Amino acid sequence: MRKLTALFVASTLALGAANLAHAADTTTAAPADAKPMMHHKGKFGPHQDMMFKDLNLTDAQKQQIREIMKGQRDQMKRPPLEERRAMHDIIASDTFDKAKAEAQIAKMEEQRKANMLAHMETQNKIYNILTPEQKKQFNANFEKRLTERPAAKGKMPATAE
């Protein structure tokens, strides 16, 4: 029985080592000059691709948009460390203090409101650098996005039968 167990362990280790060696040989490294993956981010930020699709922006317009977006990025700040710690303290306490949580939420809502206002102002600035034809296409893209049903996340598309 001991010989059988030893043989089993030895063969398992040998096969495991062979698989590791094979896996190491077949993996490919990313090129040294490759950019890191930007998940869900278009040319101008997340969810901006649909907005600018088929607008045929000029290089000057693209540069103006980059400058506008850079200005907004400088305005958009993460919640201060104290706020994040306060939120953690509420979550990690032994008892839930509803009044404290509501006060923290109110503070966070003020910041969210300011961010939304800045975002809408930025969108307006971008819209106003477009030509009349581009504005027409922009509005068509907006309407299309409103009427399209978003795909469920993590689900496979339905098969057409």
Swiss-Prot record:
Domain note: Has an elongated cradle shape.
UniProt-recorded name of the protein: Periplasmic chaperone Spy
Signal peptide residues on this chain, from the entry's feature table: 1-23
GO molecular function, one term: unfolded protein binding
Biased segments, Basic and acidic residues type: 142-151
Gene Ontology CC: one annotated term: outer membrane-bounded periplasmic space
Keywords, sorted A to Z: Chaperone, Periplasm, Signal, Stress response
Pfam families: LTXXQ
Subcellular location: Periplasm
Superkingdom, taxonomy of origin: Bacteria
Self-association state and partner proteins as the record states: Homodimer.
Role, per record: An ATP-independent periplasmic chaperone, decreases protein aggregation and helps protein refolding. Binds substrate over a large region. Protect proteins in vitro against tannin inactivation; tannins have antimicrobial activity. Overexpression enhances the stability of otherwise unstable periplasmic proteins.
Record Gene3D superfamilies: 1.20.120.1490
Family in the record: Belongs to the CpxP/Spy family.
Disordered: annotated segments: 141-161
Species name: Escherichia coli O157:H7
Record-linked NCBIfam families: PRK10455.1
